[in-house]
């Protein structure tokens, strides 16, 4: 009996089907890390905005490797991560069908960024959202009911999460509505978690209080949208021979005569990109402060590069601008386009690999222009090389005349 002498596995994974547009623009956390009561209280996720990429030079600390104590160049991604504001507390109880929401307590004051997310058109609306919740904090009976809800959470709940939102006013984006998400609190007892959340209502939480230097995290987001694509681009099927009738970038056989329908496993043209994806094990190379603070004005320097510069490249990141708030630098690339909100989450697994525990020693961060082949790291370096330009001479002559 004859048979083919070669193997031809299917092209593309069925694990990501259906390949359709994501329902949400921001990455959704579908699982939080396992709670450990022995650890101190901490949040497990944060929302940041993708700014762009650059590259760094670091010294490898890996005994036994060929590159040990040598310099390597690696690509990094920069996320702008202004502090998030906690505006609510949610308690969950365990049921046979999984965790169920038990009680929710909202803060008294919510910003327009946060309330605007609940309206399709905030400008023309009556802006009455959360008035009933605010009135509870203003009279004695309302405050008693809030305290009663918090006490019930301490007694019956097994999981405590906070409702936090981003601050869009400090970002130079056109987007005005804040991104809101529930973030699980891990560590400590349930009563301690509720007290911690109660103390931090209406307060800002910086990104360096959630993550640490050299920590391994996960990035959850929506990929770049590519639109309607053909089967070769979408599933990476093999192109047909040159003399094929009616096209080459197609699937020659889409199934048998019977059953008289095309199975879902057959590669077809359709939507590519804008899919919800989770990328695991991204190492944090640096947690930087805002360049608007005195400490953050040199957030682009290192112990080896003492130049006073920020992490922003000359001219800013393409299609994003300048990163003025706190930032997170991770190794490698990440899903999503510029300005897209990316959810950063603590790793779900116990890290055992040597790279996860390696101390990162940055020697240099590239800040040359990303709009072309940049050769200068700072504006001062460019001025020193170029000398006086024509516009400088014109400005000096006009100053003398006046």
From Swiss-Prot:
Keyword field: Cytoplasm, Ribonucleoprotein, Ribosomal protein
InterPro entries: L3_arc_euk, Ribosomal_L3_dom_3_arc_sf, Ribosomal_uL3, Ribosomal_uL3_CS, Transl_B-barrel_sf
Biological process, per Gene Ontology: translation
Domain of life: Eukaryota
Region: Disordered, residue numbers: 1-35
Pfam families reported in the protein's UniProt record: Ribosomal_L3
Sequence ranges of Basic residues compositional bias: 18-31
MF-aspect GO terms: RNA binding; structural constituent of ribosome
GO CC terms: cytosolic large ribosomal subunit
Main localization, broad class: cytoplasm
Transmembrane portions of the chain: none
Subcellular localization, as worded in the UniProt entry: Cytoplasm
Presence of the UniProt keyword Ribonucleoprotein in the record: yes
Family: Belongs to the universal ribosomal protein uL3 family.
PANTHER family: 60S RIBOSOMAL PROTEIN L3-RELATED, LARGE RIBOSOMAL SUBUNIT PROTEIN UL3
Biological function: The L3 protein is a component of the large subunit of cytoplasmic ribosomes.
Protein name: Large ribosomal subunit protein uL3
Organism listed in the record: Toxocara canis
């Amino acid at each position: 009996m004859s048979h083919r002498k070669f193997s031809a596995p299917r092209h593309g994974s069925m694990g990501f089907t259906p390949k359709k547009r994501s329902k949400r623009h921001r990455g959704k956390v579908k699982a939080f890390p396992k709670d450990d009561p022995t650890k101190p209280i901490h949040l497990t996720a944060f929302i940041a905005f993708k700014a762009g990429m650059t590259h760094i030079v670091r010294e490898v600390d890996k005994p036994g490797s060929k590159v040990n104590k040598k310099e390597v160049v690696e690509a990094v991604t920069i996320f702008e991560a202004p502090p998030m504001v906690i505006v609510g507390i949610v308690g969950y109880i365990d049921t046979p069908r999984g965790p169920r929401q038990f009680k929710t307590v909202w803060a008294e004051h919510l910003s327009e960024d946060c309330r605007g997310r609940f309206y399709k058109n905030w400008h023309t609306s009556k802006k009455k959202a959360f008035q009933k919740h605010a009135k509870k904090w203003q009279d004695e009976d309302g405050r008693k009911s809030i305290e009663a809800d918090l006490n019930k959470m301490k007694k019956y709940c097994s999981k405590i999460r906070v409702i936090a939102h981003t601050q869009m006013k400090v970002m130079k984006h056109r987007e005005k509505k804040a991104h809101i998400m529930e973030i699980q609190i891990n560590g400590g007892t349930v009563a301690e978690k509720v007290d911690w959340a109660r103390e931090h209502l209406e307060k800002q939480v910086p990104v360096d209080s959630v993550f640490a230097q050299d920590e391994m995290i996960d990035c959850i987001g929506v990929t770049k949208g590519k639109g309607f694509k053909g089967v070769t681009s979408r599933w990476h099927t093999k192109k047909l021979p040159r003399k094929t009738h009616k096209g080459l970038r197609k699937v020659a056989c889409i199934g048998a005569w019977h059953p008289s329908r095309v199975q879902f496993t057959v590669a077809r043209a359709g939507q590519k990109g804008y899919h919800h994806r989770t990328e695991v094990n991204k190492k944090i190379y640096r947690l930087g402060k805002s360049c608007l603070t005195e400490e953050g004005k040199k957030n682009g320097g290192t112990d080896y590069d003492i130049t006073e510069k920020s992490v922003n490249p000359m001219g800013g990141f393409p299609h994003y601008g300048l990163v003025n708030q706190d930032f997170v630098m991770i190794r490698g690339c990440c899903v999503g386009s510029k300005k897209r909100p990316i959810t950063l989450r603590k790793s779900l697994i116990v890290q055992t690999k040597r790279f996860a525990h390696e101390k990162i020693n940055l020697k240099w961060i590239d800040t040359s222009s990303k709009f072309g082949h940049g050769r200068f790291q700072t504006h001062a370096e460019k001025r020193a090389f170029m000398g006086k330009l024509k516009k400088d001479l014109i400005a000096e002559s006009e100053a003398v005349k006046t």
